[in-house]
């Protein structure tokens, strides 16, 4: 009987000791490596390549691993397949730019239920499928900035302009369009005559831009709020020999637009730094995976802190204007 009691006590002590060893932090005092699935709208897009560059920078600082993935075309179905793969890999966090806010929510809700920290960036996921969303800037500031550029480029701040957007279901572009329309109240001489959708695909965006130019021969400005669409719009204006007559502006990447800026096709444009966006969302994702809480200000490393509102949305920074005076410098970076 005494031997049995000793054996039981030994087993209890062993279980307790083993549990303590399993729960203890690594011997070197460093936190365990966090794996973050960084999901792009589509691969082969320069904007998201730059996002990944910033994400890898943050991962290096934090001792984390970023798995950069995405579909080959910007569809919800492609992203759902990508997300299911990340869930199967049991990543610690997922950061996604949504092609469709509602279509992704059920899959991401399943990820949340399994303990994966889910955040969106750039283009928001519906609230049911995320803990927080990091907007690159506020929608209001983006709308005001784009309309401000149109007003600067249109003769005497007056005239017609058309817009090439991404997909009809893209959360961020639709919000920016709404704020652009609101900002028009401050510029009564401007008229938005059409919105076309290039689906963030170069060839389709080009065709839509050419169609707008032919349907509205009196356009003063052609705008794109998609980085892919802005390059396509610039090419369309140049190919149609309308440089100088129709100004092109919007949201794009310095590395893709520097040549068009120097030729006067795109006199100026705006964008936040996608490297900073990737860096910031990775800082947030790792912070949450290590026990952080979005009810409190969350560190974004060198970008400072972000405070998320009651809707779970926070803004990184305001857009920056690029023109002939600075585009070459930034083109070397992204």
Where are the regions that the model predicts?
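Hinge/cleft segment of the Venus flytrap/periplasmic-binding protein
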Residues: 32, 168, 172, 183, ...
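Extracytoplasmic "Venus flytrap"
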Residues: 33-58, 62, 67-81, 91, ...
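Periplasmic-binding protein-like
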Residues: 38-39, 90-98, 117-121, 162-163, ...
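Short, solvent-exposed amphipathic alpha-helices that sit
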Residues: 47-61, 142-149, 171-190, 204, ...
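Hydrophobic alpha-helical
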Residues: 96-112, 180, 198-260
């Amino acid at each position: 009987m005494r031997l049995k009691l000793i054996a039981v006590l030994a087993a209890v002590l062993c279980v307790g000791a083993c549990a303590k060893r399993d729960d203890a932090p690594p011997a070197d005092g460093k936190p365990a490596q966090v794996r973050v699935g960084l999901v792009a709208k589509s691969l082969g897009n320069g904007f998201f390549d730059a996002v990944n560059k910033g994400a890898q920078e943050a991962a290096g600082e934090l001792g984390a691993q970023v798995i950069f993935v995405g579909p080959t075309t910007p569809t919800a179905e492609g992203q759902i397949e990508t997300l299911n793969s990340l869930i199967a890999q049991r990543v610690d966090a997922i950061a996604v730019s949504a092609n469709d806010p509602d279509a992704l929510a059920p899959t991401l809700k399943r990820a949340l239920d399994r303990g994966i920290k889910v955040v969106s960036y750039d283009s928001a996921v519906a609230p049911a499928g995320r803990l927080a969303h990091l907007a690159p800037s506020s929608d209001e500031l983006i709308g005001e900035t784009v309309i401000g550029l149109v007003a600067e480029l249109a003769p005497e701040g007056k005239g017609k302009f058309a817009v090439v957007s991404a997909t009809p279901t893209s959360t961020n572009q639709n919000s920016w369009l709404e704020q652009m329309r609101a900002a028009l109240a401050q510029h009564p001489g401007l008229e938005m005559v059409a919105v076309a959708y290039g689906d963030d695909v170069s060839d389709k965006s080009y065709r839509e831009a050419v169609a707008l130019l032919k349907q509205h021969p009196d356009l003063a400005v052609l705008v794109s709020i998609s980085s892919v669409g802005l390059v396509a719009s610039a090419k369309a204006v140049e190919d149609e020999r309308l440089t100088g007559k129709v100004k092109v502006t919007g949201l794009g990447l310095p590395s893709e637009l520097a040549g068009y800026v120097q030729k006067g096709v795109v006199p100026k444009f705006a964008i936040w730094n996608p490297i900073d966006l990737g860096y910031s969302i990775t800082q947030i994702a790792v912070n949450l995976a290590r026990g952080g809480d979005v009810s409190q200000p969350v560190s974004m490393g060198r970008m400072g802190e972000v405070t998320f509102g009651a809707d779970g949305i926070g803004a990184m920074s305001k857009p920056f204007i690029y023109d002939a005076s600075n585009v070459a410098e930034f083109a070397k970076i992204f």
